[in-house]
Amino acid sequence: MKLPKIPLILAIAISSVIPAILNSQSVTDLDGNIYQTVKIGDQTWMKQNLNTSQFRNGDLIPEVKTDVEWEKAGLEKKPAWCYYETNADNGKIYGKLYNWYAVHDSRGLAPKGWHIPSDMEWKALSTFLGGTDLAGKKLKEKGTTHWKTPNKEATNDSGFSGLPGGLNYSFGSFVHQGNVGYWWTSVEDSEETAILFSLSYENSTLADFFLNKGVGISVRCIKD
């Protein structure tokens, strides 16, 4: 039996809807936080920063509320998280800040089916978006609701919606919220440091460098 042909207009309509469906999936962590996802090239990323207080097995990640406790966690190489300036309202927008010991913990920081991206996965993302000098503008949320002016050239063409969550230094000092977004990779640079990627309000670059593992910064997850 001959199958009926799909009218061209209908075919176009269907094809335009499919990407939206693929990009509208979500994942939920053990705290009940729901993360929208976006497909960029061959990768699927969360559109929000991680905000869980539990490892994948249900164990609680210690919350740290003082400078002294934060520095101690880093020195003892123990996992920890905090809100920027210990203000839970910041978590609603920017997620939690984690030290690298939480990222690297064998109990798993990312939800099941997801993981913390390696530096090579970040670099693959950058390459797909046109390289280091162009990727940043395509990854940053548009406008200055959360980013400091001028949030240079931000288009968010990728749908990644990168936010400037700032950081908590290993000795316990909050800086750069509104100015810079930092995200851990799963890869260490040395015994004391690990690799991260960053976006800035001042340029359109996706930069990579390293910081002390006791620093608290944002985390984005990528699908297995």
Task: Describe the residue ranges of each PLM region.
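Bacterial Sec-dependent N-terminal signal peptides
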Residues: 1-25
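Conserved positions within compact, well-structured domain cores
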Residues: 3, 23-224
